[in-house]
């Protein structure tokens, strides 16, 4: 998100959703988000709860496509799938 980029904020958001029997995503909800002014690979990084990445992550999740789960030869939905979206600023 632009606001995070302008502030030099990095972090992540964890999104939960359902993969439908056609492989699309629905019901995407961000369940937690954390921010830091340091890179996630920095040993001194300290994350704090924040919502800066929540809406962008939920919108991105809806665009994901998966190969449907097959049970007994039939595609079935999968609920409670978790995906972590990580946001790291480019150092260039």
For the regions a protein language model found, what residue spans apply to each?
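Charge-biased low-complexity segments
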Residues: 1-92
